[in-house]
Regions:
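A short, structured loop/turn motif at beta-sheet edges
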Residues: 8, 39-47, 73-80, 107-109
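Short coil-to-beta-strand transition motifs
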Residues: 31-32, 69-77
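A general secondary-structure boundary signal
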Residues: 34-36, 69, 130-134
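Short helix/strand-bridging catalytic loops that position acidic/His residues to coordinate divalent metals
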Residues: 62-70, 98-101
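Short linear sequence signals and composition-biased patches located at protein termini or domain-edge surfaces
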Residues: 75-145
């Protein structure tokens, strides 16, 4: 699963991965996890938005927002975030990506994700930072006996 929705200053992205590390013996969790990147209002400062990473370690069929999860702040006081996804098939950047819909990119991951964040510098001016993350796996992982 890889779902990314754009259209505002702060897009949301949610994907499943086998990258969770189980740290305690007999923990009721596995290496499978769902990661989300989204914004949250800073509870200590008004009108401040933080970019956070959410990890849901125990998967279920409930809505993701209703399940317990760990939140880690990635960037404090972010002004904007832009996510773009490189489609090797179309040779173009896409604003959204959804592997769960038949009219989306079913069974296909982007080869790269371009992440651009806007923050305020020490002079209170917008400052943009951009990087790209390469996704090495493009094919779905199917467990067919």
């Amino acid at each position: 699963m890889f779902v990314a929705k754009s259209g505002s200053r702060f897009p949301e992205i949610r994907f499943s991965t086998l990258g969770h590390r189980v740290l305690w013996a007999d923990a009721n969790e596995s290496e499978q996890t769902v990661i989300s990147y989204l914004t949250r209002s800073d509870p200590e400062r008004r009108n401040v938005t933080d970019w956070v990473r959410r990890e849901q370690r125990r998967l279920s069929n409930e809505q993701p927002d209703e399940e317990p999860a760990e939140y880690d702040i990635v960037l404090r006081d972010v002004q904007a975030v832009k996510l773009e996804f490189w489609s090797w098939k179309d040779q173009d950047w896409q604003d959204t990506w959804d592997t769960t819909q038949s009219d989306g990119q079913r069974g296909m991951l982007p080869t790269r994700v371009r992440i651009t964040v806007t923050i305020k510098d020490h002079n209170d001016k917008d400052y943009k930072l951009s990087t790209q993350a390469r996704i090495l796996m493009q094919e779905p992982l199917l467990a067919i006996p």
